[in-house]
Amino acid sequence: VPDISIVCAPDATGDDGLTADVVEHCEEMDDRFGILQAGRTDSDVGNLSPPADTDMAAFYYPWLKVRNPETGLVEEVPPGGHVAGIYARSDASHGVHKAPANEVVRGVVDIQRPVTKGDQEVLNPRGVNCIRSFRGRGIRVWGARTASSNPQWRYVNVRRLFLFLRGSIEQGTQWVVFEPNNEELWARVKQTIKNFLTDVWEDGALMGSTPEEAFFVKCDRTTMTQSDIENGRLICEIGVAPTRPAEFVIFRISQWTGDSN
């Protein structure tokens, strides 16, 4: 199914096989982000941690209490569905570059068990995103870390912004399949990508006081070999600064042009 950006399996909790399937799927597809959740009985803060070290998912705790609209009874549910809704709401309101944290969890009565400031200080560095109840402020998601130990991909919004940028650029340059692989095409592709990234920077998603501090785009003989050019393979190198000006996360995209066999 195309255009999926978030994956959440409501029945996948804790360190079970379905959770592992979600992580494996997101890592293999490399264009979507998973929402993982603690098990219902996971209450030992000292031993709680994400079930996998991955930058393609985030882990949430604890379960939530909701009122069943049919019976009127309060039931406990895993947090993944509500968190997925918060992702979608934040994306629509602010953009994918905004961290889905300090967001009110709507439609819940309470959290399954209280999460203290001390719990937060233990769990957050491990990549456990806590859901907490604050007097007068409601129940909120109080963390936006991925389940990764890699500092580059520590935060959900940075990882998801990168996925969004790469996917958008790949989709927005598919037209090159009809074009000859020459310097004129490289200049057009470079300008197309720069125009897109300038819009992203102006929206506040990239850091830097100038576009040069926020991103760079290369599409020339330094990014392609003669063999690439002759075989119709166009390669661009792109750097973006999602957290600090001029500190670039670099990636490459490639497309087949009209010169490909």
Regions from the language model: what does each represent?
Residues 1-261:
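Structured, hydrophobic secondary-structure cores that serve as assembly/anchoring elements
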